[in-house]
């Protein structure tokens, strides 16, 4: 901790010392706020992350975790939505925006971040639901994520017969881009790209 942030024995900042004016937030809470800004409000990922990292003085490990989590979730969003839809009774498109982003972040951790135990991804997602005034939906979040943990490795992806859907989900690319590539290069070359 920097010298100028020391507190005296009363718990108050020592006289004349600088204190950061930010409320402590978990890295996952910051990731959730970033995802809402990016996916729900249409803001640019790099600008959102830059703003968060400027505002909150995170340790290097937490900065790296935040950036990997947000950038990876944005990058794999189509695949994540497909997996969530397989294990949720409520389609991703009909979920509350905050719930949708909590699930996306957690499923990304389960599928792509080996250093995060599945149980931690689930528990932290439930905590995020509670922290963000979604207590009635914490059971829904927990249930979907437990199903993902149990079954995601056996998730049937769209068959290659449906070329566009197959490539879209497998590579997490919008269908319009896949269509354009297939029209221009054919299926095999598009898949190789």
Where on the chain are the PLM-derived regions?
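Class I Rossmann-like S-adenosyl-L-methionine
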Residues: 1-193
């Amino acid at each position: 901790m920097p010298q100028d942030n020391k507190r005296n024995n009363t718990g108050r900042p020592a006289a004349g010392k600088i204190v950061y004016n930010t409320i402590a937030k978990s890295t996952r809470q910051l990731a959730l706020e970033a995802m809402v800004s990016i996916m729900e409000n249409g803001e640019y990922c790099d600008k959102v992350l830059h703003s968060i990292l400027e505002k909150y003085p995170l340790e290097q490990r937490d900065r790296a975790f935040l950036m990997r989590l947000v950038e990876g979730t944005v990058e794999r969003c189509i695949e994540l939505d497909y997996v969530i839809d397989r294990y949720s009774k409520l389609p991703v498109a009909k979920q509350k925006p905050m719930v949708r982003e909590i699930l996306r972040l957690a499923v990304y951790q389960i599928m792509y971040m080996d250093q995060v135990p599945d149980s931690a991804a689930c528990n932290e997602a439930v905590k995020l639901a509670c922290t963000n005034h979604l207590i009635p939906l914490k059971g829904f979040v927990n249930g979907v994520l437990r199903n993902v943990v149990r079954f995601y490795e056996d998730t049937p992806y769209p068959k290659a017969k449906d070329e566009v859907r197959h490539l879209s989900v497998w590579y997490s690319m919008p269908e319009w881009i896949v269509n354009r590539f297939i029209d221009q290069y054919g299926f095999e070359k598009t898949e190789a790209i």
